[in-house]
Amino acid sequence: ARLSDPGYAAPAGEEYRPDLRHVGKDREKVDAQMLVQGERAFVEDRLPQDVCWLKVLGSPIAHGWIKAIDTSEAEAMPGVVAVVSHLNTPRTLYTSAGQGFPEPSPYDQALFPRKLRYVGDRVAAVLAESPGIAEMAIKKIKVEYQPLEPVLSIAQAKTEGAPVIHSGAVSYASGEVPEGISVKGDGRDDGIIYQFSLHADPHRNLAASASGGIGDIAKGLAEADLVLERSYRANRVQCTPLEPHVVLARIDAGRLVLHASTQVPWHVRRIVARVVGISENKIRVIKERVGGGFGAKQDLVVEDLAGYLAWTTRKPV
C-alpha cells in the first residue's frame, strides 16, 4: 500500500464535545514532526565531542567476596581517565528503586559492593577517552574472588542454613527494630538501612513480609466443609525496550547535569545526590525522550555511577 492510496489511512473518527477545544478533537501528535525529521531527541543525540566512556567489569560468579583487586595496569594505560572499585569509592548505601519517599525499598547497595550477589554485579569500572580504550583497560584489571555457595531459588533461600545473601548489619531510620530480628552482621559486608519496618529479616533471606487475617481463622478452618491449600508462583518479568538504559552526565556551571532516559527524573535527582554527596539543587536531570521503558526505567541502572564519575573527574560521561 502507498500513502497516496485512498484506503491506506483509516478515516478519522467523528469529532464530539463542541464545547471543548481538545477533548474529542483530531489533533496532530505533538512530537511527530520532530521524530520523522530526525531532530535531536534522545540521550545519544546530546553527546559532546570530548565525552568519556564508562565500562563496567561484571562479576563472573553468582555469590562471593572480592579478596583483592589490582588496577595498576589499567590505570597506567594512555587514555584512561579513572579506574574505580569498592577500594576508592564511598560506602554510602542507597536504593536504586526510588518510588515513594521515604522509600520502602531498603538501602542495600553501594556504588561497588565488597560482597558479590549475582553474575554481573559491579566489580570495577573504567572511564576512558574511547570505548575501545575502556574495553582494553577492563581486561587489565586483576581480581581474586572467594566464591560462596549461590542461592538459586526461593525454595533454597527459605531453607534452614541457606547461604545468606545480605550478611551485613541491619539498621532502621525510624521505628523500633522488629522483635526477633538479628541486626548484627558480618563487618566485611555493607549493611542495610530500612526507612521503616517491612517485617524483613535479611539474615534469613527475607526481603519483606506481610500477613493478616479477619476473624478467628483457626475456628473458621476447623468448621469449614472444605479447606483448599495451594501455592502460586509468578515468574519475574523484565521489559526489553528498544533503547537500553543510557545517560549522559556532565558539569555545567558547577552543577551536575544528567541527560537521562528515565521515567522518574525526580527520583534520579534524589538518589544521585545521596550517592555523590551533594545537595539536590546541585543536580539537574533532563528527561530526554525515552525509547521505551514499560516500568523498567523506574530504576537507576547507570545514572548513579555515571553521575559520580562526572562529578569527581569533571569530565562528561
Label every PLM stretch briefly.
Residues E73-E75, R269-V285:
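Phosphate/pyrophosphate-binding loops at sites that engage ATP/ADP/AMP, CoA/4′-phosphopantetheine
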Residues H86, K282-E288, K315-V317:
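Beta-strand segments within the central parallel beta-sheet cores of soluble alpha/beta enzyme folds
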Residues A1-D190, V227, T312:
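Flexible, low-hydrophobicity surface segments
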Residues R270, E288-R314:
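Thiamine diphosphate
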Residues F101-P102, Q263-P265, A273-G277, D299-L309:
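A glycine- and small-aliphatic-rich helix-loop capping segment at beta-alpha/alpha-beta transitions
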Residues G191, N205, G212-G215, G254-L256, ...:
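Helix-loop-helix module between adjacent transmembrane segments
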Residues A210-V276:
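Conserved beta-alpha junction segments in alpha/beta enzyme cores
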